[in-house]
From Swiss-Prot:
SUPFAM superfamilies attached to this UniProt entry: FMN-linked oxidoreductases
Cited function: Catalyzes the conversion of dihydroorotate to orotate with quinone as electron acceptor.
Positions bound to FMN: 61-65, 85, 138, 171, 216, 244, 267, 296, 317-318
Subcellular location: Cell membrane
Cofactor note text: Binds 1 FMN per subunit.
Organism whose genome encodes this protein: Pseudoalteromonas atlantica (strain T6c / ATCC BAA-1087)
Lineage: Bacteria, Pseudomonadati, Pseudomonadota, Gammaproteobacteria, Alteromonadales
InterPro entries, per the entry: Aldolase_TIM, DHO_dehydrogenase, Dihydroorotate_DH_1_2, Dihydroorotate_DH_2, Dihydroorotate_DH_cat, Dihydroorotate_DH_CS
Designated name of the protein: Dihydroorotate dehydrogenase (quinone)
Length: 335
């Protein structure tokens, strides 16, 4: 079924296809048409951050930005689902066109720019979902918010999503919001994390519930930059790390149509770079902070390699677009 749908969608503009798919999933997730993507996957539980995940394969943030299709992705058999990135206020994102396929490398370039309907809308969608599994909510800052006021945006989102999330991911690594990646380094990172951890403690008392905070990092990091980040993670006591976001590197797609488009590159061409960061990160953290691996996970082999590198949980996005829901089952069955 997916192969037929994909053949049609790949004749259309990439963002139009994305929007069509989200709307279709939204309309079918609660009726018999969900048979098109619903599948049974055996449980392979993983304990992580004190939470039981029914299997280690999750949906990465960015596909269901507004949490409109949670039950559809649950029907596909994901072990956990991450929605967002969401910002305090709704925003349109960057100018179109802003999403491009590079089929030769099963890759996608996007410069969406955190387009979303705002955190209040997302929370309402989460409340309406029937899903009772592990839900991550990925939060960001509005484009118009200055870097030195970024913490306020993250705190607004954290307070609003806290009661509804299994974990919260702080996105400081998208390349499509000007200045955002500057928050990954030095004092800026430490101050951001300290502010978030302080509010987490307040919210834990208020809601009588501890919700872990994870940081999503970029793959485009020098070893010294990664060392600095690890120091901040250990000093502040961050709960977990998601590695990695999309890359600005184009070495693996040179000469392909759309290769020089601005934005973050994801897909199979990211496999080696993300694998390297996860391996290095897990070595440096030495088990003190757990890691979720994402980026170019397009096969059972890639999934196993990421898990063996030290990330017991993994996420997929681009490979799901190219291969369909069967990929989830193939990975889980192989583990």
């Amino acid at each position: 079924m997916y192969a037929i749908l994909q053949k049609f969608l790949f004749t259309q503009d990439a963002e139009w296809s994305h929007d069509f798919t989200i709307n279709w999933l939204k309309r079918t997730q609660h009726n018999f048409l969900n048979v098109a993507y619903k599948q049974h996957i055996d449980d392979k539980p993983v304990e992580f951050l004190g939470i039981t995940f029914k299997n280690p394969v999750g949906l990465a943030a960015g596909l269901d930005k507004n949490a409109e299709c949670i039950d559809a992705f649950a029907a596909m058999g994901f072990g956990f689902i991450e929605v967002g990135t969401v910002t305090p206020k709704a925003q349109a994102g960057n100018d179109k066109p802003r999403m491009f396929r590079l089929p030769a490398g099963q890759a996608i370039i996007n410069r969406m720019g955190f387009n979303n309907k705002g955190v209040d809308y997302l929370v309402e969608q989460v409340k309406q979902a029937k899903y009772k599994g592990v839900l991550g909510i990925n939060i960001g800052k509005n484009k118009t918010t200055p870097e030195d006021e970024a913490l306020n945006d993250y705190l607004i989102c954290l307070r609003k999503v806290y009661a509804h999330a299994s974990y919260v991911t702080v996105n400081i690594s998208s390349p499509n919001t000007p200045g955002l990646r500057n928050l990954q380094y030095g004092d800026a990172l430490t101050q951001l994390l300290e502010g978030l951890k302080e509010e987490q403690a307040n919210l834990e008392v208020k809601h009588n519930k501890r919700v872990p905070i994870l940081i999503k990092i970029a793959p485009d990091l020098e070893d010294s930059e990664l060392d600095s980040m690890v120091d901040s993670f250990l000093t502040v006591g961050i709960d977990g790390v998601i590695a990695t976001n999309t890359t600005l590197d184009r070495d693996r797609v040179k000469g392909q149509e759309h290769a020089e488009e601005a934005g973050g590159l994801s897909g199979s061409v990211l496999t080696d770079k993300s694998q390297q960061i996860v391996s290095s990160l897990c070595t440096k953290l030495a088990g003190n902070v757990p890691v979720i691996g994402v980026g170019g996970i397009d096969s059972p082999h890639a999934a196993k390699a990421r898990i063996e590198a030290g990330s017991p949980l993994i996420q997929v996005y681009s490979a799901l677009i190219y291969q369909g829901p069967k990929l989830i089952k193939e990975i889980v069955d192989s583990l």
